[in-house]
Amino acid sequence: MKSNLLTAACVVATVFALNCSGTVDKEAGVNSDNVLLADWSGPYGGTPAFDKMDLAALQPAFEQAMADHLAQIDEIANNQDAPTFENTIVAMERVGRPLGRLFSYYGIWSGNVSTPEFREIQGELAPKISEFNTKITQNEALFTRVRTVYEGEEMAALRPDQQRLTLLAYEGFARNGATLEGADKDRYAAINKRLAGLHTTYANNVLADEEGYVLYISDDQLSGLPDSFVQAAAVAATERDHDGQYAVTNTRSSMDPFLTYSDERELREKVWRTYYSRGDNGDDKDNNALIAEILNLRHERVKLLGYPNYAAWRLENRMAKKPENALELMEAVWPAAIARVHQEVADMQAVADAAGAGIKIEPWDYRYYMEKVRKERYDLDSNEVKQYLQLDKLREAMFYVAGRLFQFEFKALEAGTVPVFHEDVNVWEVVDKNSGDHIGLWYLDPYARTGKRSGAWATSYRSHETFDGKKTVLSSNNSNFIKGAPGAPVLVSWDDARTFFHEFGHALHSLSSNVEYPTLNGGVRDYTEFQSQLLERWLTTDEVIDNYLVHHETGEPIPADLVAKINNAATFNQGFATTEYLASALLDMRYHSIDPAGLDADAFEREALAKLDMPGEIVMRHRSPHFGHIFSGEGYAAAYYGYMWAEVLTSDAAEAFAEAPGGYYDEALAKKLVDNLFAVRNAIDPAEAYRAFRGRDAEIGALMRDRGFPVPN
């Protein structure tokens, strides 16, 4: 998942004069001794002063940066010269550099090194940031200038990328309340302010439940667990002052392997219930009431703009265009997915019965018996595969792929060359391997720890641009791998290896940018997962398998027969994977397509899943009380379908590589991919970009073939 953690404020404001890339700018900077606002110094065009982050400076920095930012906005809005692309749209691109730098630090505190002290400040800042955004979106004079450029004669004479920049600026106002007046205008601002606080509270409640619930087990409760998990759990327990025990933390990276391998059914149930009850424990961290208020406020807000529901507003400028199109795709896949689940459950039940387990398959059994079926049917042991999946070697494999496709070379920087925010973080310089030109830096924060949110994500501290001189990229990937004992290799699951490649795809999307204006580094939500999903396919290429999937003890490459088993099992468990995702995506769309007055979130979730005939042996990937994608901000609200929308493109593009003379490393097709689908970022309409690559629109058949489902007519 890409989540740059600059909060919804930064995401929304990017299209109208808030540069959130942290780009250095001597001209539009503020004069301040506050380290969080200072120009970035040092090599590589300057880098964040992560080693000087001072939480006490955060609130004063926001107050100063927002005030100076609004003053610069007023200068543009009150310019007496006739509005032009240069004095309005480009002028807006120059505003917000210090605030962009500040949001880079804010994102680190929020996602990587959060503390109770920060979360208190975050709660105070959220409504202030919302008010700041509203002052920009409701600046009538500024919107008038933007609209004049958008509707004026100059528009036709602009380059295509400049036209798109102008369109994005116009939509940033028109779709966010700029046309409202009087009481409606005031109410819109009040809703945004309240939502900002609710989103922050929701996210902090989930994090509190993740940090507050840890299961400690003893030696006699380790049956079935791999040595790598046991060692990591021992380290996690020691870090929490529970020497001699083993900690199962309340995160996916700990829950998933425990449910897959533990022979202790009662403990599996306990871990499952704890994980899927985050934000749903009837205490002061319970999110159900927040969900109802969030949905009602979103609905009220878009009604002020004239839309029937939130989903209609959200999808208007996405690839799907309207909710019906997104639902049509998901509902086309759903029947095949749940049919496969029923087959998978029957297979698992047969294995359990043959072993005399005397149980009915429940959600906390699914992963455990799925693994036994995999072993029985394909003679494939996931833990055996894991012995060949070393984190460091996977990173080298990603660098190899980047070199072949993008002509990038990654050079490790010595510790201390640039500041980092935690000792776990390492940094690489990225250069063009042919010319030697500097491309940017790549930061990696790989390990789970207290204060770091769960999951995996990518972000950029600075984006590529050239309109005021070239600025190079500062990109990062963040994961939650379980750190092993000192000196021991970090071994990961096949799914985690795919996720590692996925998030690196986001980083490559940033690093390959060739756009002129910073705003064009943004993206369309149901398209931005395409590039990252596509990069996952290179994990299974022969070049990666033969050279980087090597045994952590012997150094021997993964055996051909084990690779064959992996390939044979490629569509195994697609019922589970597709159904848990689609259930979340469908519920997201339904939440945002109704009038939520009087909503009971828990009842709505249960009733919606019942209407879908959701198999009882599976739970949604993200239950409503911890569905941070859609309730801790608005980035994925009515947009979680975007992963599947993007996967249609992914599967279709993958078939293009499979058919190419050089396969996945075909030089001509790789160049076409980078030029048309990576480097252009959001400078071109995504549908147009894909047609330039493929020669046609993507087709759903490739997706169905990928998952082993029947292809619809």
Language model region names:
Residues G42-A57, Y106-L125, T148-A190, T249-A289, ...:
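Short His/Asp/Glu-rich catalytic/ion-coordination signatures at enzyme active sites or charged loops
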Residues D161, L165, G197, N204, ...:
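Active-site-proximal, well-structured secondary-structure segments within enzyme catalytic domains
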Residues V24, A28-A57, Q64, G224, ...:
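C-terminal, non-catalytic "cap/extension" segments appended to globular domains
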Residues I482-F501:
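Short pre-active-site segment immediately N-terminal to the catalytic Zn-binding motif
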Residues A8-A17:
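Bacterial N-terminal signal peptides
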